[in-house]
Amino acid sequence: MKSKNLGLVDPNSTSGNNVPRFELNKLGIPDAEQYFGKVVFTGSHENAMLALAQGTVDVAANQWTSDDDSTLAQMLHKSMLKNPDGSPMKKDDFRIIHKSAPIINGPYAYNSDLPEDAKAAIAKAFFDAPAKDKAAFDRLQDGQKKGFHPATTKDWDGTIELIKFVDALRKKKAS
């Protein structure tokens, strides 16, 4: 991929900029701008896929949760990506070359001073939501999540490492 064009989403995107740079660094590419011929921000996850499909970029970073849950899958399902002849592109027209570890979502939290029965009721409401009203839960989660689970601070270790990396990048740019 050296000297090829890289499409990123937005400077403030976690899945479309910060995580890809973090992953590239782990692969021995600490400076994307020096390694790739050109690095462009496409403005959105969808635009990154369009740029890749149209050949504007050779590689693009994007959101990917699973084979069926990604910007690429959503756009292919809606026939938004086209071949030059106008026919819809297929999954086989693309190649996933790297996947990062999952990006953890922000937590739902409650005040630790709440009474224990209130804490238990809140947790139960979240954990029971997918079974109690699946249609409402699917709408709330865009059909992308299976449910909630308790988390610990250890679950955010990767995110903390990412934040430190991004902070170091910003400091390097500023100097």
Predicted feature locations:
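Alpha-helical secondary-structure segments
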Residues: 2-3, 124
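Pocket-lining segment of extracytoplasmic ligand-binding domains
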Residues: 5-115
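An extracytoplasmic/periplasmic, membrane-proximal ligand-sensing/linker region
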Residues: 110-175
